[in-house]
Amino acid sequence: MDKRKMKKLLILNLPYFLVGLFATNLGEAWRLAEGADSSAKILSFFHALPIALNNPLPSFHPLDLLIGILCGAGLRLAVYLKGKNAKKYRHNVEYGSARWGTAKDIEPFIAPKFEDNVILTKTERLMMSNRPKNPANARNKNVLIIGGSGSGKTRFWLKPNLLQMHSSYVVTDPKGSIVIECGNALLKHGYTIKIFNTINFQKSMHYNPFAYIHSEKDILKLVTTLIANTKGDGKAGDEFWTKAETLLYCALIGYIHYEAPIEEQNFSTLIEFLNAMEVREDDEEFQNPVDLMFEALEKKKPNHFAVRQYKKYKLAAGKTAKSILISCGARLAPFDIQEVRDVTAYDELQLDTLGDQKTALFLIMSDTDATFNFLISMIYTQLFNLLCEKADDVYGGRLPVHVRCLIDEMANIGQIPNLEKLVATIRSREISACLVLQAQSQLKAIYKDNADTIIGNMDSRIFLGGSEPTTLKELNQALGKETIDTYNTSNTRGNSPSYGLNYQKLGKDLASVDELAVLDGSKCILQLRGVRPFLSDKYDLTQHPNYKYTSDFDKRNEFNIEQFLSRRLKLKAGDEFVVVDAD
């Protein structure tokens, strides 16, 4: 037993020890008392008691010490039994302790400077620092925003947080309205603007997934992302075909990455490879041009990654190989469109630099047609992997500029592979993800059992209003019950009239399902991990200090995408240019 525990034990038992010493004087008084019977003995005890107490020191007579020990031990036993059998009362929280949060509850989580916070509601904010003075107040910056159509997900939450301008931003922009309204505000504050537009490829910068392949594992990641987001909405087919496609994609992309010139490392080359892969069911010995290319490569580099993958694919019989090629052709059909081939010919987005300096990347997508949304999902997948690797390999684990992904209409971009693992690990790298949904069930439809893991890694959850039953039921359960006071009255009339009043306590939902369904349009509910929930007003965009730079304030502030892209210098492979040092 260490000294601290010994000291604590002595302090707790000191009162009983003192009572025992005092009781030795009682034993001495009883011993000095005279009497033939018990009545006389008791009467004499009270006469002898003052004599025994005149001596402040305890009596060390064996009989007196025994009485002292019995009294001290008896008192300790009585206290122990009393405490063990004590009734546990929780006044005013008998049926639940739920309540709405107050300004005092959120105060420890707010940074002194307004611009150093994530805006959650009109009155609640969350500091951007991942290392507050008190570690107990540390929360990740992942946010789940749920609100039905017209609840103000963009106006009341996404735009105000974009205007905070404390990080680099990756913004999913349905219809392309956010960049038009906020783009100039970001430019005026020194941001680098990048745009990828799947609605109109003519108004888009170029994105080439092949530009971010640096190793064999990157090839497999790209193939996994491609397959996950081009499988369609129908019933899943035989897993054999998916694995066979994976082998062929890995082989062809591996060849392109390691053997083709840089200007040919893109999806256009991959499509040309597939087009050249003729298969004859009645002639197993037939070799197409791609077979000959891999045969030549095998002679030079027999252990080449692409060769190993291609040899496994070639184990398939002619009819099977033809089916695999048809599946690949159907999956890559969007890349037969010339605009798609052009926009993926080379890369301008430089995804791995978003954590180096303040940058805003707008991913414009259609909210009615999901044909090309798989490209957005591929960007997010590569973005997370690239930034995590750069944080670990270059910056010692933390990016110099925080990167916030504001993913509006999350359900429309397709599945981001391993998102449940990413949201749990990106915090330490100075990356955060904000998922905007119309209903919680959308997330479960895409990520199945992993949806709960994703939600569990969102320290902040905001409900802006909606009527989807599953969302309302789960929020109702999460808010809990409060204890309320009720009273009943009784009034009996007749020959002997009487009146009664009865008070009692009951448990009531802090917000019932029907109350959540009719939530005031100006209100929202915030849940912050470890803190009581808040019923607050939505943030008013017009009150933001940077609102005056947006086109919502003045139409002259509109960001012209076409003009912005036309002013940029476009360099292609093979172009000659002269670099002039301005210094």
Enumerate the predicted regions with their spans:
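Basic- and hydrophobic-enriched, low-structure N-terminal and domain-boundary segments
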Residues: 1-151, 155-158, 481, 492-493, ...
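P-loop NTPase motor domains
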Residues: 24-28, 136-431, 446, 505-506, ...
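Conserved long hydrophobic alpha-helices within structured protein cores
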Residues: 114-116, 120, 374-382, 475
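Low-complexity, polar-biased intrinsically disordered regions enriched in Pro/Ser/Thr/Gly
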Residues: 126-132, 231-240, 262, 485-505
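Conserved ATP-driven motor cores of ASCE-family P-loop NTPases powering translocation/secretion/packaging/pilus
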Residues: 423-525
